[in-house]
Amino acid sequence: MAEVIGYYGTGRRKTAVARVYLRPGEGKVKVNGKEYESLNDYFKNPAWTKHAIEPLEVTNTLGKFDLVIRVNGGGLSGQSGAVRLGIARALLQYDQNLRPVLKKYKMLTRDPREVERKKYGLKKARRAPQFSKR
């Protein structure tokens, strides 16, 4: 079997995990085994799509790679952030010289914000039950 040249990156955001493979091509997109015209067909929201493909835009590599993405967990917003980090990390495997550009736009930083856990005695993480003086 012929070995396919590709670049791999893992991205995480909130509870979403994305495994991204970049393969030299003309910009085809495959998410969770299903072919899409563009990422916009998967994310539906143009803001999430723009956020996800930003690493390709700032490095002028948009249309040079086919994207094969496996993403699970979280919602579409978290998945968008996970895909973004995965693409950025895969681009580093492709060319280490892209690091300063990606670093400048903070695309190699994993967003550490997670949902705060709910505490007992409270309605949510911080929301206390209503208090009545009388």
Swiss-Prot record:
Keyword field: Ribonucleoprotein, Ribosomal protein
Region spans: Disordered: 114-134
Database matches in InterPro entries: Ribosomal_Su5_D2-typ_SF, Ribosomal_uS9, Ribosomal_uS9_bac/plastid, Ribosomal_uS9_CS, Ribsml_uS5_D2-typ_fold_subgr
Annotated Basic residues bias: 120-134
GO biological process: translation
One matching Pfam family: Ribosomal_S9
The UniProt record lists the keyword Glycoprotein: no
GO cellular component, one term: cytosolic small ribosomal subunit
Stored PANTHER family: RIBOSOMAL PROTEIN S9, SMALL RIBOSOMAL SUBUNIT PROTEIN US9M
Family: Belongs to the universal ribosomal protein uS9 family.
Name of the protein: Small ribosomal subunit protein uS9
Organism field: Thermotoga sp. (strain RQ2)
Phylogenetic placement of the source organism: Bacteria, Thermotogati, Thermotogota, Thermotogae, Thermotogales
